A protein has these predicted regions:
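Metal-dependent nuclease catalytic cores that hydrolyze phosphodiester bonds in DNA/RNA
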Residues: 1-91
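Nucleic-acid nuclease catalytic cores
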Residues: 69-164, 766-768, 772-773
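Conserved pre-motif I regulatory segment
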Residues: 184-226
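Walker A/P-loop
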Residues: 218-240
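Conserved RecA-like P-loop NTPase helicase motor core
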Residues: 601-612, 662-773
Length: 811
C-alpha cells in the first residue's frame, strides 16, 4: 500500500513498512529483508506460526489492523497485518516474528538498529490493537533461528503515549517529505506545459509518432511502434513521454538491450531544455562495486559499513539531486566512493527519486535484479515504460525464465570450492554433488545411444524444495564463516551455487505450482546430453505471462523497433492486453532511390543445400565487394558457415578482409569500427547476423556502402526450438513462422537497417538465398523495399546491379 495522501480530505494512509523505510536505511542483503526473504526464513516463519496455531487456543494469524490518529490538521491511518494474535485472560497478546541466525546475530542484537526496527513495528501494532479494542495489550518479539529452528521470545515494553508521539512524529516527517515532493511536482507540471522539443524541426514521421505516443500515454495504451532506422524514434518517443510523466507525477523507465542505446537516450535527455526533472542511468552492480569483492554486507565491505549513518550525515542523495540534472554512473561512483558508501546502493536511491530511469531491461523485467518499484503493481501503475529495440525483449524475457543447471558449470564450482578453506567448504562440496546428481538423474532418463540427446523429463518438486532449504542453510553458515574472518574470494563459488539454484527453483515453482495446480504449458523441463556435459533446463517457450504482468501493470507503455512484424506476434508474446494495444507503422523518411535491395535467388542456403552452394555464395560476396566503392558488411547465420565461405573467397585486390573473433571484446569491436572509419582501403567485414556488428551499432556517413545478408538466419533446429514450434502451432497455428521465420527475418531486417541512417546515406542491400522470394519469408520483407511485389527485387547479377547503382548515385 505504501503512502496515500488525500489533500482535499486531509487524510494520510500509511503502512508500517513505509514508515520504517523512511526511518531506517538498509543495504544489500538487508534491503530485501535479509533472512526473512529467504526460502528457509519463510519456512521457519510458517513453522513457528503453525506451532502457535496448534498449541495456543484461539491463535490468529495475518489479522488486519487499522488505527486512526491526528497529525496536526491531518487524520492519519496506519494499516497493517499482525503476524500473530491471541487472548490471554483479559489482555490481547500480539506477536511479531523475525528470522535471525542466532549464532551470529543474537549476540549483536541488543541496542542495534535492527532490534529498534523490530520493536518499533511491534509497538505500533500494540497501539493499534489497544485503541481498536480498548483492552490491555502485551507484545512478544518472537525470534526464530533459521539454522536450528529454535525460538526465543522477548517481551516488549509498551508506553502508549510515547509510541503515539513517536508515530505522530514519523508521519509528520513523511508529510513534510510529501509536501516538498508535491511542490516540486507542481513545478514539474508547470514546466511540462512548455517543455520544448529539443530540435528546430521534426523529421518526416516524427510528429505523427510523437502525437501517437502522447495519446498512448494519455489513454493508458500499449503502443507498438515499427519505424525504420533514421526516423528519430528516440526523441519522438522520449519527449512526449517525459511531458506526460512530469504532468502527472509519473516515473518514466527507459529500457534498452544495449548500453549504446542508453547513451543515445541520455544525450537526448541532455538536449531537452528543462530544469525541474532529474534522470539517472543505472549500471550493473558488478561495475558499480567499489569493493574488491562483490559481497553486500557491512561485515565484508567498508562501503556498506555504517551506510545509513554515512548517507544521513553526508546528504549525498540530496546533494546529487540538487547539483545535477542527469546522474551519470561515473559521477555517482566517484561521489559515493568519496563518502565511502556503496555506489550501487546510492544509484538505487537516486532511481527511487528520479523522474527518468535509464537502464537495461533487467531493471524492470528480470525477477532477480529488478528494482523494487518494478515489482510493486501499485508503483507500476504510476509509471510509463519505454522499451527500445523491443524485438529483443521476447528472447530476453524467455531467457529470464529459462534457467538451467549445467554439469560442466557445477563441476567448475566444485573445483573452486575444493580450494576454498572456509569451514563450510565440505558442506558446500556435498551440496554441489547433490545438485549434480539431480542433473545426472535427469540425463539418465534419456536414450542411451548417441553422444547427444534431449527430451522432456519429470521434475521432483519435493527434492527441489529440500535442496533449496539445505542450500540456504549452507548460505547462512557460509556468511557466518566470512563474518568470522574466512578469506573472501572473487566470484564466490558458494554464492554462485546458491543463486544459480535459487533462480532455477523459483522458475520451477512457477512452471509447476505447488498445491496440485495444473503445470503451466508455457514451460518444459528438458534434460540434455551433449559432448560438453549434461544439462537440466527449464524452457520458457512463451514469456507472455511474466512479461505481461509487468507491462499491463504500467500506466502506459511504448515498445518500439525497426522490426515489430507481425505485430500480433509481439503483442501476444509480450503479454500485452489486446484491448489496450495499438500499432503504429511508419514508412522510411528517406528517398527510396538512396537504397537498392537485390535478391540473389540462384543460391540455396538451407541446411541441406548449404555445402553445395558455398562456392557461389563466396562469388556473390566477392562480386558485391568488387562493385562497391566503400566498405561492405557480409552477415552469415553462423561462424561455421562464415568460415566455409571465407575459405572460398577469391582474391580481392585493394580490399581488406576482417573477420572478428567469435567472442570479440569491446576493445576489438571498437578497433574494427575504427578500421571502417579510417579512410584507408575499403573493408569487407565478415560477421554473423544478430551479433555485435549487425544490431545496436551505427555506421554513420560513409562507413558502410553495402550489406550482404546470407540466408534468412533461422534459429538452429534443435529440440528446444522444436518444442517452441509445437507450442506455437497449438496456440496460434503458426508454429514454424513464430519459432523460426519471425526471429530469422527480424535479424535480416535489423541487419539491413545498419545501412541507411540519414537522408544523405546511400547503399545496397543484397539478400542471398532463393527463400527470400518465397512464402512465408517474402511476407516479412518491408514494404518500402519494393514497389508492388517482392519479386521486383530479383537480380540476375548482383555484382552488375550493385555497380550500376553506385554509378547512378555518383559514389
Amino acid at each position: 500500500m505504501g503512502l496515500s495522501v488525500d489533500l482535499a480530505r486531509k487524510t494520510v494512509t500509511v503502512s508500517p513498512a513505509t514508515l520504517l523505510a523512511g526511518a531506517f536505511r538498509r543495504i544489500g542483503f538487508d534491503r530485501g529483508e535479509g533472512f526473512e526473504r529467504l526460502w528457509i526464513g519463510q519456512a521457519v516463519h510458517r513453522r513457528v506460526l503453525g506451532e502457535f496455531l496448534e498449541g495456543v487456543p484461539g491463535y490468529e494469524t495475518e489479522r488486519a489492523v487499522r488505527f486512526s490518529f491526528d497529525v496536526d490538521d491531518f487524520t492519519a491511518v496506519l494499516e497493517g497485518r499482525l503476524d500473530g494474535r491471541f487472548e490471554d485472560g483479559e489482555r490481547v497478546v500480539v506477536d511479531e516474528i523475525k528470522s535471525l541466525h542466532f549464532a551470529e546475530d543474537l549476540g549483536r542484537l541488543a541496542g542495534s538498529p535492527r532490534l529498534v526496527r523490530f520493536e518499533t513495528q511491534l509497538r505500533w501494532y500494540l497501539l493499534a490493537v489497544a485503541r481498536a479494542e480498548g483492552r490491555e495489550v502485551a507484545g512478544r518479539l518472537v525470534l526464530a533461528d533459521i539454522e536450528t529452528g529454535a525460538t526465543r521470545i522477548q517481551s516488549v515494553a509498551f508506553d502508549p503515549a510515547a509510541v503515539l508521539a513517536d508515530l505522530t512524529e514519523r508521519v509528520r516527517w513523511l508529510l513534510a517529505e510529501f509536501h516538498a515532493a508535491h511542490a516540486l511536482s507542481e513545478a514539474k507540471r508547470a514546466e511540462a506545459r512548455t517543455l520544448p522539443f529539443p530540435f528546430e524541426d521534426y523529421r518526416p514521421g516524427q510528429l505523427a509518432m510523437a502525437a501517437e505516443v502522447a495519446r498512448a500515454a494519455a489513454t493508458g495504451a500499449h503502443l507498438l511502434v515499427e519505424a525504420p532506422t533514421g526516423i528519430g524514434k528516440t526523441v519522438a518517443a522520449l519527449h512526449p513521454l517525459l511531458v506526460d510523466a512530469l504532468s502527472r507525477g509519473r516515473k518514466l523507465y527507459v529500457l534498452t538491450a544495449k548500453t549504446t542505446q542508453q547513451e543515445m537516450f541520455v544525450r537526448t535527455l541532455d538536449a531537452i531544455d528543462g530544469e525541474s526533472f532529474r534522470s539517472v542511468r543505472l549500471r550493473a552492480k558488478e561495475r558499480m562495486c567499489a569493493n574488491d569483492v562483490v559481497l553486500c554486507h557491512e561485515d565484508h565491505c567498508r562501503f556498506a559499513k555504517d551506510y545509513a549513518a554515512k548517507m544521513e550525515s553526508s546528504g549525498l542523495v540530496e546533494r546529487l539531486l540538487d547539483t545535477r540534472r542527469h546522474l551519470d554512473p561515473d559521477d555517482v561512483f566517484e561521489e559515493a566512493r568519496r563518502e565511502e558508501v556503496c555506489p550501487f546502493e546510492v544509484s538505487l536511491e537516486l532511481a527511487e527519486r528520479a523522474d527518468v530511469v535509464v537502464g537495461d531491461y533487467n531493471y524492470v523485467f528480470d525477477p532477480v535484479v529488478s528494482l523494487s518499484g518494478a515489482r510493486d503493481p501499485a508503483a507500476l501503475g504510476e509509471a510509463l515504460l519505454l522499451v527500445d529495440e523491443a524485438h529483443n525483449l521476447v528472447d530476453r524475457g524467455r531467457g529470464y525464465y529459462s534457467p538451467e543447471l549445467s554439469d560442466a558449470e557445477l563441476s567448475g564450482l566444485e573445483e573452486r570450492i575444493g580450494s576454498f578453506l572456509a569451514r563450510a567448504a565440505w558442506d558446500a562440496a556435498e551440496a554441489v554433488r547433490r545438485v549434480r546428481r539431480l542433473v545426472a538423474d535427469a540425463a539418465a532418463l534419456l536414450p542411451a545411444e548417441g553422444p547427444e540427446a534431449a527430451d522432456l523429463v519429470p521434475l521432483d518438486a519435493r527434492r527441489l524444495d529440500d535442496l533449496r532449504h539445505d542450500l540456504e542453510a549452507l548460505l547462512v553458515r557460509h556468511l557466518a564463516d566470512l563474518r568470522a574472518g574466512a578469506d573472501r574470494i572473487p566470484d564466490d563459488p558458494v554464492l554462485d551455487l546458491y543463486f544459480t539454484f535459487a533462480r532455477f527453483h523459483d522458475v520451477a515453482r512457477m512452471a509447476q505450482p505447488p498445491g496440485g495446480e495444473r503445470p503451466d504449458p508455457a514451460f518444459d523441463v528438458v534434460a540434455i546430453r551433449a559432448p560438453s556435459g549434461s544439462r537440466l533446463l527449464l524452457l520458457c517457450k512463451d514469456p507472455s505471462r511474466p512479461l505481461g504482468a509487468v507491462l499491463n501493470a504500467a500506466a502506459a507503455t511504448v515498445e518500439m523497433s525497426a522490426t515489430l512484424s507481425p505485430p500480433e506476434f509481439y503483442r501476444d508474446l509480450l503479454g500485452l492486453s489486446r484491448d489496450r494495444t495499438d500499432v503504429l507503422r511508419l514508412p522510411s523518411p528517406f528517398p527510396r532511390e538512396n537504397r537498392a535491395v537485390f535478391v540473389a535467388a540462384d543460391v540455396d542456403t538451407s541446411y541441406a543445400a548449404r555445402t553445395r552452394d558455398v562456392p557461389r555464395l563466396a562469388a556473390i560476396v566477392a562480386e558485391v565487394a568488387a562493385a562497391c566503392p566503400g566498405n561492405v558488411l557480409a552477415l552469415f547465420p553462423s561462424y561455421r558457415f562464415l568460415d566455409d565461405v571465407r575459405a572460398r573467397l577469391p582474391a580481392l585486390p585493394g580490399r581488406r578482409v576482417l573477420r572478428p573473433s567469435d567472442r570479440s571484446t569491446e576493445l576489438e569491436r571498437t578497433s574494427t569500427l575504427g578500421t571502417l572509419r579510417d579512410g584507408g582501403s575499403p573493408v569487407l567485414l565478415l560477421a554473423v547476423s544478430g551479433g555485435a556488428f549487425a544490431e545496436g551499432v551505427d555506421y554513420p556517413g560513409e562507413m558502410l556502402s553495402a550489406v550482404v545478408v546470407v540466408s534468412p538466419a533461422l534459429p538452429q533446429v534443435r529440440f528446444e526450438q522444436e518444442r517452441m514450434r509445437q507450442y506455437f502451432e497449438e496456440r496460434f497455428e503458426k508454429g514454424f513462422e513464430y519459432a523460426y521465420v519471425v526471429p530469422g527475418m527480424t535479424r535480416v531486417v535489423q541487419s539491413a537497417g545498419r545501412l541507411i541512417r540519414s537522408e544523405s546515406d546511400t547503399g545496397v542491400v543484397v539478400l542471398a538465398c532463393k527463400r527470400f522470394l518465397r512464402e512465408p519469408y517474402r511476407r516479412y520483407l518491408p514494404a518500402d523495399w519494393y514497389g508492388d511485389d517482392p519479386s521486383e527485387l530479383l537480380s540476375a547479377s548482383v555484382g552488375d546491379d550493385t555497380a550500376a547503382f553506385f554509378a547512378r548515385t555518383g559514389r
